[in-house]
Amino acid sequence: MRHYEVVFLVHPDQSEQVPAMIERYRGLIEENGGAIHRLEDWGRRQLAYLINKVHKAHYILMNIECDQETLKELENLFYYNDAVLRDMFIKRNEAVTEPSVMASQKEDKRRGDK
């Protein structure tokens, strides 16, 4: 199985459905023998440019391990889901488990660090 980094942007009006979407994608990956090594919900953030007349989106990052068929199925789910504004799949050489820069910045703000 291969490792992938997946980032997808959800329409801000659908933010309350994000946990259910994550569980559906998690179920698909795990039922086909894959694993999620890192899952981060970056929350609602400003976009650099308008996408479908929307200036904010809900960002989700997942590092997954799955086979090619599962990846294609996941790509199709994103493609046909109107709530997903953009998605990006990057092939990785190994599993990434440490927190991303975005998550560590969010944690620093919570603690009051600069």
From Swiss-Prot:
Annotated membrane-spanning segments are: none
Q: What is this protein called in UniProt?
A: Small ribosomal subunit protein bS6
Q: Any idea which UniProt keywords this protein has?
A: Ribonucleoprotein, Ribosomal protein, RNA-binding, rRNA-binding
Family recorded in the similarity comment: Belongs to the bacterial ribosomal protein bS6 family.
Keyword flag Ribonucleoprotein: yes
Q: Which gene encodes it?
A: rpsF
Name the job this protein performs.
Binds together with bS18 to 16S ribosomal RNA.
CDD domains per UniProt: bS6
Q: Which organism is it from?
A: Hydrogenovibrio crunogenus (strain DSM 25203 / XCL-2) (Thiomicrospira crunogena)
The record's PANTHER family line, in alphabetical order, gives:
MITOCHONDRIAL 28S RIBOSOMAL PROTEIN S6, SMALL RIBOSOMAL SUBUNIT PROTEIN BS6M
Q: Which InterPro entries match?
A: Ribosomal_bS6, Ribosomal_bS6_CS, Ribosomal_bS6_sf, Ribosomal_S6_plastid/chlpt, Transl_elong_EF1B/ribsomal_bS6
Q: Which domain of life is it from?
A: Bacteria
- Kindly list the GO CC terms recorded for this protein: cytosolic small ribosomal subunit
Q: Does the keyword rRNA-binding apply?
A: yes
Q: Which GO BP terms sit in this record? A: translation
The uppermost taxa in this organism's lineage are: Bacteria, Pseudomonadati, Pseudomonadota, Gammaproteobacteria, Thiotrichales
